[in-house]
Amino acid sequence: MTTDIENMFKDKVLGHPAGLFVLFFTEMWERFSYYGMRAILVIFLTGAISGNNPGWGWDTSTALSLLGTYALFVYLTPIVGGWLADNKIGYRMAVVIGALLMTLGHASMAIETPTFLYIGIALLIVGNGFFKPNMTSIISKMYAGKDEKKDGAYNIFYMGVNAGAFIGIMLCGWVGEKIGWSYGFGLAGIFMFLGMLQFYYAQSIFGSLGDKPKKIESNTTNTTSKDKTEEKLNPFSMLDYSLIVVFIVSALIFIINDPLSKIGNINTLNFTIAGMSDSLFFALVAAITFIILLIVRIPRYTRIERDRMIAFTIFCLFTIFFWAAFEQAAGSLPIYTRDFTDRILEGTAGTIFKVIDLLVTVIPMLVITYVLVKLFNKTFSKISLSNVILGISFLIVWAIIIYKLYVEFQATETEVPITWFAILNSLFIIIFAPLFTKWWDSKYNPPASVKYGLGLIIMAIGFGFLAFAAKDIPLGAKTAKLSMIWLVLAYLFHTLGELCLSPMGLSYLSKLVPASQIV
């Protein structure tokens, strides 16, 4: 393993192993497909069933329920996928399996029938479970013993995340809105497939890194067990187990019944208690049970661990509220954009937008293409087929971009696409992330609690702009013509809030968790 790591560090691109940039582009195509599909899902489902590009005419609550269910399982399945990769199949095989399943998922959604929509979403969920946790695991193994380089590696990797989100939303969104929804879903699948092939044929560059795990020697296990016994344990009591069972059962009932009742009109329980629906009742039971479990268990820790667990719980609560609000970028915000925002630009305003659109499209792509050329120079002789596939992917992207710009500049009327606003998040991250990094590295770096508070407050201000803009819309109105500036401000403040909370969130939470709780 050590030899493989040293060999990878011999061929460097921008000061890092070429293998990092193989992962960079693989992750970029996966995020392209994920954010591209997500950008058009709700507006497709809730779109009018007539017109040049008809949707399915779902009501908003049904569409958002499907999106929420998808998001829930997207965050749950990596637990299983990570375990399988760690113990059974290896990181690289998990990535390939996940990418293939997600390719099939996007292809299914492109067929545009309810059955294939559900099959597609199920495949995306399972594929994400295999793919998502194991990309960062490969990076972690790649930089074993080189901690001074690891932060820079993750920064580069997450630039790939933002690049993929930016390009995916822009192209899948435009193709879906202007040409056809199935083409938008299909485009996401095409690039997921190309990303899988690019990674598959580049595996030789990693050596044995990420291979199927070998059997762990018993002395390692014994040492680990001995170390853990030195920690003061907090064993589970019968009351703890009972509360856990009630929580799991109630949560599962809610997870299964809520989407079935809203999407499929299949209500497996069909009762109300104190005015609450069955799904809401079990969600409340699960929440209360979990709170009781925390109240019962936390006081049994030692004083230092207890204080850390209390702080950890509070910060987790803040994090849940933040991301629940932030994820509206895929749910309620596209509907707000479509139905309540004036997106028509005339005369000089239309021309200015076209120029801005050209610049924000072409400049990031030129930067990413430069990185591609650097990778080619270092690795073409070793992983030529992977690089050819990657080159073809970029040619397709550039062709779509040129066609998109040509169509937009030829149009006599300028209508800003609904999905265009969603790219602002990635754009603002690229612009402001260096400034926040300098702030965090300066003597004025605030404590984590202040950063969390700032993140939540700034996020709230973003929604405040939208609420202020909509204050004069009559109750029950189906459409309105609000200025686009309110949406731009909302996305700006949401991004600033994310930059306050997200980069340090996981790191800070990991420091709060007692050592005995880390597996």
Question: Language-model segments: what does each one mean?
Answer:
Residues 1-18, 22, 145, 176-409, ...:
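Intracellular loop-helix junctions on the cytosolic face of multi-pass helical membrane proteins
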Residues 28, 105, 116-131, 316, ...:
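Hydrophobic core of transmembrane alpha-helices in multi-pass small-molecule transporters
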Residues 38-40, 79-80, 162-179, 461-468:
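A gly/Pro-rich, aromatic-decorated transmembrane alpha-helix motif that marks the paired
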Residues 44-77, 149-152:
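Extracellular/periplasmic helix-loop-helix junction of adjacent transmembrane segments
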Residues 64-85, 132, 166-168, 423-438:
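Central cavity-lining transmembrane alpha-helices of secondary-active solute carriers
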Residues 74, 149-177, 184-199, 354-360, ...:
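Glycine-rich segments within core transmembrane alpha-helices of 12-TM secondary carriers
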Residues 94-95, 452:
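Primarily marks hydrophobic transmembrane alpha-helices of the MFS/SLC 12-helix fold
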Residues 97-118, 398-408, 457-479:
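C-terminal ends and interior cores of transmembrane alpha-helices
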